[in-house]
Amino acid sequence: PRGSPRTEYEAARR
């Protein structure tokens, strides 16, 4: 499944 909101957030922020 998708990563945790933390990981997704950090990956999408940059």
Swiss-Prot record:
Write down the chemical reaction(s) this protein catalyses: Endohydrolysis of the N-glycosidic bond at one specific adenosine on the 28S rRNA
UniProt superkingdom: Eukaryota
- Keyword Hydrolase: yes or no? yes
Q: Which UniProt keywords apply?
A: Antimicrobial, Fungicide, Glycosidase, Hydrolase, Protein synthesis inhibitor, Toxin
- Gene Ontology terms, MF aspect: rRNA N-glycosylase activity; toxin activity
Query: Is Hydrolase included in the keywords of this UniProt record?
Result: yes
Instruction: Set out the biological process GO terms recorded for this chain's protein.
Output: defense response to fungus; killing of cells of another organism; negative regulation of translation
* EC numbers, comma separated: 3.2.2.22
Q: What does this protein do?
A: Has antifungal activity against F.oxysporum and M.arachidicola. Inhibits cell-free translation in rabbit reticulocyte lysate system. Has some N-glycosidase activity.
Q: Which protein, by its recorded name, is this? A: Ribosome-inactivating protein luffacylin
